[in-house]
Amino acid sequence: MLHTLRSLWVWFAVALLIVLWLPLLTAIRVTDRSPVRYRTGRWFRNLGVIMCRANPFWKIHLSGHTRVTDPRKPYVVISNHQSLADIPILSHLPWEMKWVAKKVLFRLPFVGWMMRLAGDIPVDRADPHSGGTMLLTAMRYLEGKCSVMFFPEGTRSPDSRVHRFADGAFHIAIKAQVPLLPVAIEGSYRCLPKRSWRFGEPSSVHVTVLPEVPTKGMTVDDVGRLKTTIRRMIIEEVARARHTTVDAVDGLSTVSPSAVSS
């Protein structure tokens, strides 16, 4: 009962923050002259950070290459995807990046409106033209020295393991000749379990920024190898943080999901 009441309280606080943040973000957008809406985007990510701080269930730990010397150096950022909580959690990273997200999210009241204000990138898998539009928008941001963020699994992991990566993000990085920045997130699947509105037990989430991987000189022929390299880096880091084996984290391995420790 106490756990349910705490979850209700956190959702109330989150809803209040979202409603209050919309007019603030609208005012910032009106005065933001940057073609990539950098300041608007950063203020939107700040909402995610505040939401995490308002939640007594979550403790966020950042490690790795988080100290960037140039926040305007463009990357294609790649992360595994364990939970809806990943979005506010990854907003702790100290640079602006535009998120590639399902088009349906942009239709949500308040949150979807703010995603549009911040300049995030919608993609509709049912529309064959949507991928091309997404690519052009992502390229424009990268040319404007703003990073772009992808969950290449395309959806939340059903079992907390790292599943198959799509090619799109890697094509974009090679086309733009910008480095890839792998990010491994571990523990968020406990924060907000799939198909549940209640927050999980108090959880520590570890976000590790791994070394960048250059794409200079690569061509489309390198997409498969590059994708395998990045996915392997993330799997190895998740396995290290979880104190388990690589096979237990790899969603394409023959190891049963039940072997994944919680």
Give residue spans per PLM region:
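Membrane-anchoring hydrophobic helices of lipid-metabolizing enzymes
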Residues: M1-Y75, T254, A259
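Catalytic core of membrane glycerolipid acyltransferases/transacylases, capturing the structured
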Residues: L25-R42, R53-N55, D70-P128
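A generic structural signal for alpha->beta connector loops
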Residues: F57-K59, E96, L117, K145, ...
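Non-catalytic C-terminal accessory region of glycerolipid acyltransferases
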Residues: T4-L5, G132-S262
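A generic structural signal for well-ordered alpha-helical segments
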Residues: C52-R53, M115, Y141, A173
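A secondary-structure boundary/capping signal
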Residues: G64, S79-N80, A101-K102, F151-E153, ...
